[in-house]
UniProtKB/Swiss-Prot annotation:
<dbReference type="InterPro" id="IPR011060">
    <property type="entry name" value="RibuloseP-bd_barrel"/>
</dbReference>
<keyword id="KW-0028">Amino-acid biosynthesis</keyword>
<comment type="similarity">
    <text>Belongs to the HisA/HisF family.</text>
</comment>
<dbReference type="InterPro" id="IPR044524">
    <property type="entry name" value="Isoase_HisA-like"/>
</dbReference>
<dbReference type="GO" id="GO:0003949">
    <property type="term" value="F:1-(5-phosphoribosyl)-5-[(5-phosphoribosylamino)methylideneamino]imidazole-4-carboxamide isomerase activity"/>
</dbReference>
<dbReference type="Pfam" id="PF00977">
    <property type="entry name" value="His_biosynth"/>
</dbReference>
<dbReference type="InterPro" id="IPR013785">
    <property type="entry name" value="Aldolase_TIM"/>
</dbReference>
<keyword id="KW-0368">Histidine biosynthesis</keyword>
<dbReference type="InterPro" id="IPR006063">
    <property type="entry name" value="HisA_bact_arch"/>
</dbReference>
<protein>
    <recommendedName>
        <fullName>1-(5-phosphoribosyl)-5-[(5-phosphoribosylamino)methylideneamino] imidazole-4-carboxamide isomerase</fullName>
        <ecNumber>5.3.1.16</ecNumber>
    </recommendedName>
</protein>
<dbReference type="InterPro" id="IPR023016">
    <property type="entry name" value="Isoase_HisA-like_bact"/>
</dbReference>
<feature type="active site" description="Proton acceptor">
    <location>
        <position position="9"/>
    </location>
</feature>
<feature type="active site" description="Proton donor">
    <location>
        <position position="131"/>
    </location>
</feature>
<dbReference type="GO" id="GO:0000162">
    <property type="term" value="P:L-tryptophan biosynthetic process"/>
</dbReference>
<comment type="pathway">
    <text>Amino-acid biosynthesis; L-histidine biosynthesis; L-histidine from 5-phospho-alpha-D-ribose 1-diphosphate: step 4/9.</text>
</comment>
<dbReference type="GO" id="GO:0005737">
    <property type="term" value="C:cytoplasm"/>
</dbReference>
<dbReference type="GO" id="GO:0000105">
    <property type="term" value="P:L-histidine biosynthetic process"/>
</dbReference>
Amino acid sequence: MIQIIPAIDIIDGKCVRLTQGDYNQKKEYHSNPVEVAKMFEDAGIQRLHLVDLDGAKKKQIVNYKVLENITAATKLSVDFGGGLQSDEDLKIAFDAGARQITAGSIAVKNPEKVQHWLTQFGKECIILGADTKSGMIAVHGWQETSDLSIQQLMNQFIPFGISYSICTDVAKDGLLQGPSFDLYKQLNEEFKQINWIASGGVAELADIEKLNDMGIYGVIVGKAFYEGRITLQQLAQFNA
């Protein structure tokens, strides 16, 4: 059964969503992320994708207190991302209670660093953030596009045991038009050793059911939940 992973994106300590990664298209949903996390846990959900959007912009961890407060108040298994660049950033995140971290831009800019993290912290703790824009990897909160394809990116980390990857199609994110099913099908067939987590575009329950039928490991649900298109009860049925 597919893993349901709700997303909480943080700016100024508050729960927000961006459209297509654009900081100018920001909508605030809740002033207290801990309450949102508790709501997920109360519904039977076990995981959380927590993104420090301030950190992604500043290229260093910013909202670690929110992470700390969520892991203190819930038993959710949290993966944390956004601007993680250094060993010290990872230490802060893990000390604050993160079960996993997502390495995004740093995997493109400094692959040796992420290879080192896989060796040092173990493959269960590191998720590769593969954000694609027209087939190429987007970095720094999707403000820039690199000259790497997703296949080239993955091949840099497979020898180091990478097991988890969140793949976001930036063109789909926040638009509620459905995920990039063809992309996930291709990646799932091409890289069978990777637990793929689909992100971006989920608009209704049928999208999650289709990803589940395709054998995708996990799905991140954001705007569809916050806009009331998918209920907590519907999400929780996958964890039954």
